[in-house]
UniProtKB/Swiss-Prot annotation:
Residue ranges with Acidic residues bias: 54-63, 70-81
Matches recorded under InterPro entries: UPF0181 (IPR005371)
Organism: Serratia proteamaculans (strain 568)
Protein's UniProt name: UPF0181 protein Spro_2806
Family affiliation: Belongs to the UPF0181 family.
Pfam families with a match to the protein in the record: UPF0181
Source organism superkingdom: Bacteria
Annotated segments matching region Disordered: 43-81
């Protein structure tokens, strides 16, 4: 679970959205409908295991580019200091 919510398939996400819309059409506020559907999902998926993978490749490339750009700026500041 990520932030207390299980990982859902596309179909499960669509069903949840449809359920939220149905509850709202029946007069429930959006916040209450979302909270109710979220609770139903939590109860249905209680005990599920979710694997989370992070893709940090883009962050690493951006970090590698920055030091070169900043190195020139830093050296100019040092001369004027």
């Amino acid at each position: 679970m990520l932030a207390g919510m299980p990982s859902l398939s596309h179909l499960e996400q669509q069903e949840a959205a449809d359920r939220i819309h149905l509850l709202m059409e029946q007069g429930m506020s959006s916040g209450e409908a979302i909270a109710r559907v979220a609770q139903e999902i939590r109860e249905k998926h209680q005990g599920d295991q979710v694997s989370v993978m992070f893709d940090d490749e883009d962050d690493d490339e951006e970090y590698q580019e920055r030091p070169d750009d900043q190195a020139d700026d830093d050296s100019e500041e040092d001369e004027n200091y």
